[in-house]
Design a protein with these regions (language model features):
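Gly/Ser-rich, low-complexity
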Residues: 1-90, 103-114, 118-119, 123, ...
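Extended, low-complexity, charged alpha-helical tracts
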Residues: 122-126, 133, 295-299, 303, ...
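Mid-bilayer segments of alpha-helical transmembrane spans in multi-pass integral membrane proteins
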Residues: 95-104, 123-140, 160-168, 172, ...
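Interfacial loop-to-transmembrane junctions
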Residues: 300-320
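Loop-centered beta-sheet repeat module
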Residues: 150-211
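Membrane interface segments of multi-pass transport proteins and intramembrane proteases
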Residues: 80-84, 183-198, 297-306
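Small-residue-enriched core segments of transmembrane alpha-helices in multipass membrane transport
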Residues: 88-99, 119-128, 156-162, 194-207, ...
Length: 344
């Protein structure tokens, strides 16, 4: 039975860039007939354009990093005659690198927070649609539990990411720059603490989400005649590791992922892709450029700069993990709804 869903709330919560990209592809609804006209070449062209735009800032940063490191290396070669100013050279280099990378990192953290907030709004806009689909398929119990528990669990992941992990990364960034300027202070312990704390926070909230999802499936499955797959998932979904949590979530809903090829599923994927891919690709670009900059700094023997670039790389890699987990939460929730309600 074909159902008409109200997507006005979803469109209103899409970013301007995502709305423009979807409009250029001709995606204005979740109608299967309209989406069938979507060409692979157009999608790849849009993704290539995103990748190019995302790599512009990281490549500029890499050029600046290379220039600063080469200049610092040349000045360090005269360290015997500039003994008193040897530390000054490295300090100036760290400050230059901070301006080239740390300042964009602050802006990137803010952008990531905005994208997560947009995803949270998209998530809330999708919940009534999913609940209607479940109710229309005759799964009244699943519809009620899906709307209540999935909202709480999914919003919990996004709120922890934006309100706890991102502020911790701001603190980490400040300590990393301070440690690079004054390495004798010994702030490495604080950097290690914040790194572990952010990873465990992210792992914990993802584990809670998969646990709630699995328990909801096990409970509603007893009433809605679901298979035993959700019950098996409930036994192995409490490991506080992001990769493990996502893996277990995938195992639970992998049988229903084929349903995402329906009109509603494709629209979910496209909306998430064009919301997250621009910032995600930029984060990956910064991570790669910082890795290359760190390798160059080590080759040139500029140890202070290498440590700073490594710390900054940790910021971007952590942000990348967050930006992967948040859309995964929404995609998994959608797949779970499809598993119960069937194709819309």
């Amino acid at each position: 039975m074909a159902l008409a869903y109200d997507f006005s709330g979803v469109y209103q919560n899409l970013s301007d860039e995502a709305s423009r990209a979807l409009s250029e592809l001709g995606v204005t609804s979740a109608d299967a007939d309209a989406l069938s006209a979507l060409s692979f070449e157009n999608v790849m062209a849009a993704l290539s354009k995103m990748a190019g735009n995302g790599m512009t800032a990281p490549l500029k940063g890499l050029i600046t990093m290379t220039a600063v490191l080469l200049l610092c290396s040349m000045l360090t070669a005269y360290q015997n005659s500039l003994t008193e100013s040897g530390e000054t050279v490295q300090t100036v280099a760290v400050l230059c690198l901070s301006g080239a990378v740390a300042v964009p990192a602050v802006g990137f953290i803010g952008t990531a927070g905005d994208v997560i907030a947009q995803c949270a709004n998209l998530f809330l806009a999708y919940i009534p649609i999913m609940a209607v689909m479940l109710a229309a398929s005759g799964r009244a119990v699943s519809s009620a539990s899906y709307q209540a528990l999935t909202v709480a669990a999914g919003q919990g992941v996004m709120r922890v990411s934006s309100d706890m992990i991102l502020p911790l990364l701001h603190i980490f960034l400040g300590i990393a720059v301070s440690s690079g300027i004054a390495p004798q202070v010994g702030l490495g312990g604080f950097l290690s603490l914040i790194t572990k704390l952010t990873k465990w926070l992210l792992g914990f909230v993802m584990a809670v989400f998969t646990a709630v999802l699995s328990l909801r499936q096990a409970a509603s499955g007893a009433l809605d005649s679901l298979g035993s797959r959700a019950a098996r998932f409930a036994l192995s979904s409490f490991v506080p590791v992001v990769g493990g949590a996502l893996s277990e979530a995938y195992k639970t809903v992998q049988g229903s992922l084929h349903v995402l090829r329906s009109g509603l599923g494709i629209f979910v994927i496209l909306a998430l892709a064009f919301t997250f891919l621009p910032v995600l690709l930029q984060g990956l670009g910064w991570s790669l450029c910082l890795f290359a900059g760190k390798a160059l700094a080590e080759a040139l023997g500029v140890s202070h700069c290498a440590k700073l670039l490594e710390a900054l790389g940790t910021v971007f890699s952590t942000l990348t993990a967050v930006l992967l987990c948040v859309p995964a939460v929404m995609l998994i929730a959608a797949a779970a709804a499809f598993a119960i309600g069937g194709e819309a």
